[in-house]
Amino acid sequence: MTQSLHLSLGQHARQGMKPQMQDFHGALLPEGGQLALKGAVVALADGISTSPHARTAAEMAVGALVTDYYDTPESWTVQTAAGRVIAATNRWLYGQSRAVAPGDPDRGFVCTLSAMVLKGCEAHLFHIGDSRIARLAGDSLEPLTENHVSGGLLSRAMGISAELRINHRRIPLQAGDVFLLTTDGVHAHVTGRDLRAALERTADLDAVAEHLVGLALQRGSRDNLTAQVLRVDALPDPGTAALGDEAAVLPVPPLPKPGQEIDGFRVLRPLHHSARSHVFLAEAPDGSKVALKIPASEIVEDPEARRRFLLEDWVARRIDSPHVLRAAPLPGPRSALYGVTEFVEGVTLRQWMTDHPKPSLDEARGIVTQVADGLRALHRREMIHQDIRPENILIDASGTVRIIDFGSVAVAGVEEATPGLMGALPGTYQYTAPEYLSGDVVSWRSDMFALAVIAYEMLTGLLPYGTQVARVASRRDQMRLVYRSACDEKSAVPLWMDEALARALHPDPLRRPDALSEFLASLRRPSPGWQAAHRRPLAARNPLRFWQGVSAILAALCLILAAQLGG
């Protein structure tokens, strides 16, 4: 069994000298897979003292983050997931503020927020306002956040505006780290020496938090007081923070023969095999046909390969799109390491391209559009396929296109928990975006590049850069790539579509379209920019009118010249 993140937390809050409690705090320290893939959340908020809605605002800010964060996709990064929850909560608070006190934020749903999400070997800090997160360093408290205060007033807070600037910071964790989250009623009156002394007296972190609150009161605090003391007891083993236990524990089953069963799936016949896996047609307990995938024996002793195999099934179970191969339901817990998906009768796009060497523009556009729809489903979950090529696209008898094979998928949230799981360079050089080879930033635009290569190949039978991409080793090499136009006497590709392909295939990712939808639109009709740059002259659009105009001008010039000569 691998080591997981282990945390200890103590909390205490007191109304103090104020007539009502306007602070709120909360935390959730999950276990198992949820801890590995989402992490632990610790947060506190301080409502502004001038508002009768301060407590509600603080409670909403903390409560929404602690609960709604865990409802976001596991594939999202912490910054995306927590950032969207905080932004949505802020919009709700701002809406309430406008309803009860339009133009007067001092009486609105306004509060501070300071939160930590601890995932893997990192902590993510989210901060708005003048609450504080600090780390104990010797006998000192190292502030990890800055106060958003100007002229004694909050310059940034939840509920003041529909748009919110969130301070986000990532810091590495070490076993033994101690963090202190406080509202201003506490941190203005206690020191690192106070925290260190309290920790030396007791191992009870709740008692430590209570002691700090009591000290602040004794030293004259007249505000509400909240303190959270968080200690990192152990860090997860490197590279095993997510998907590690199941991949390590489950045995690789022996290759089954027709008629044999694995967890209720009855094997019918082999479908395909490769160096990584063997795929069988099987019958599920409900009678439906499924594809049963078993890892090859070569990966049995490779922990990373086992985790990546399991990640394929993990990805399939988190995408809901008619253009992405779906995972099939499991009748119960797995007894062995395998994956199971829907069975689709069809051909790969590679075979389809062989059978249709000269597709119409509409046929090519239809396939590209469906692949793009599947990619968008992945990208919305912060996943990059990384191996889009004709062999990994399936077309069934009805013409529905599906993306298959998730062995190279990069999942931002999993990579965050398990650095290095993404492994070696994915994909096939002919379809690999040059940034993978040059070390440039990889993003969803890398998938768009591969899709554009496929579109180009369907329409021309060629590759836009030939074998040039395989020789890229630096940014300089990347920018030297020379695009080969798709327009020639053998293709029916119009100039405006060639420009659309060239843009999606630009060596610089930032010069490619800003969205897949923009790329698709540019394949259907000339872009406004292209039309402006290639507006046909009158002589080409209406030769008769052009020459009539020229003749009229020449006649007028002749009359003027004759008049001058006659005079």
Predicted regions and their residues:
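Conserved HxN/HPN-centered segment at the entrance to the catalytic loop
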Residues: 320-328
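Conserved short submotifs of the Hanks-type protein kinase catalytic core
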Residues: 334-348, 352
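Protein kinase catalytic-loop region centered on the HRD/HxD motif
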Residues: 373-383
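PP2C/PPM-type serine/threonine phosphatase catalytic domain
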Residues: 1-291, 297-311, 318-320, 332-338, ...
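C-terminal lobe helix-coil module of Hanks-type protein kinase domains
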Residues: 430-530
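Conserved short alpha-helix within the protein kinase catalytic core
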Residues: 361-372
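Regulatory activation segment
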Residues: 415-426
